[in-house]
Amino acid sequence: MNFSRFAIIVFAMLSFIGCGGENTAIVDDVKAGESEPSPVDSALEARVAAMLGIGYPKLTNENAEDFLLDWGVENNQDFVTMHTKHGDIVVELFNDVPLHKSNFLYKIHRQYYSPSEFIRVLPDFVIQGGNSEEEKPQQMRYLIGTHSLPQEMKDKYVHTRGALAMSRSYINNPKKASSSYDFYIVTGRKISKHELASIELEKNIRYTSQQKRRYNEIGGTPHLDGEHTVFGSVIQGMNVVDKLAATPTDNSDWPVERLEVNMTSHSRIE
């Protein structure tokens, strides 16, 4: 359901409430004969409340971390499915990157990513999503709140093919804080042992033998290691990622066709 339809629903609700006391008796009569709301009605109300922020604080850099970690304890899910025109991508979220995991799940719960789109496609590198030039993402960011995320980088999570990570600004960001909305999935390319050794030396990184083997056999983008927080990995649907990555782009790496994505979270693989 798009934003305009939600707005119509809420406007109708507010108009009804604004009728005042003269209709109180009629409303009471209606209430007396009401049946219990159906599961569909309850689900719709929950989606409207989540999208419009009813009962949720507006997030800032001051309150976001505590709120998201607390929310994540009560709303923990381990998997996210990204539904696209080419098929589904299933991602596993890492439990030991709790803030980024909770943030992603919360934005899904608030309907930010339904729909959203992949807005940058860079061959042999990444596909990036979470923002667009359309009005809805800007409206939703205003409703949810503008904030960043303290980085949670871990040596064991690197940018091999299929890694899910958050984007970040490289300007005035010495602590490498993450965006709380923009994400990317790594496609990458195969990395030779010599090239990986150079990256280790340049970035003062020591890869495990397994990480070296994965970079050599399936590829990735190792120069992003130590720069962005990886918080999940594609476990199904990399062929779908490859189809999205093959989309023609303009000179700014924007796909020439809309690559819409809708997201759902769940506790097990469906």
PLM region descriptions:
Residues 7-15:
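Bacterial N-terminal signal peptides
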Residues 19-270:
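Cyclophilin-like peptidyl-prolyl cis-trans isomerases
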Residues 1-7:
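Bacterial N-terminal signal peptides that target proteins for export
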